[in-house]
Amino acid sequence: MRIRLDIAYDGTHFRGWAKQPTLRTVQGTLEAALARIVGSDVQFVVAGRTDAGVHAVGQVAHVDLDEAQWSRIESRQGRAPQDPAASIARRMRGVLGAYPDATVTRSSVAPDGFDARFSAVWRRYRYRLADSTAGYDPLRRHDTTAHRGVLDDQAMDTAARTLIGLHDFAAYCKPREAVSYTHLRAHETRG
């Protein structure tokens, strides 16, 4: 049974998405939580990996559960019966704790043919910068890059607008069979 997982995380204390021995990663944390629920190891496939310190909202992954794992999901619905696939997110949140830095916001049976990596049709990235003119908001310290000088908003906006449109980034990619898209279409920039 393929399950789609919608994920959010604060990457501040993670060493990126991809599971690595001895390092705390988003994938390792979430897979361990689900493995505890289904009683055996699982492996997530994600729409796009992130680096250390990168946050995500709306990240999508999928996991394939075998018959025994799915049976454990179905047989442990608790007092409030609900869709077994939807219960995975709730149960993972329970394992992860009250205020986790990674969570599954939604889980559902994936539609036929769904693959988190290859079914993704768009991504949104947000980069936050603050300069010395505005001061630094301590509540944004984990998601905003502080620049000691003064940023030229107009120059940055002009440069960012050159990215709008369709561009081929094949020259920046390692040749790999699994990579089928090297084009990027930027739709907007915001100052």
Locations of the language-model features?
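Structured-RNA-binding interfaces characteristic of tRNA pseudouridine synthases
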Residues: M1-E188
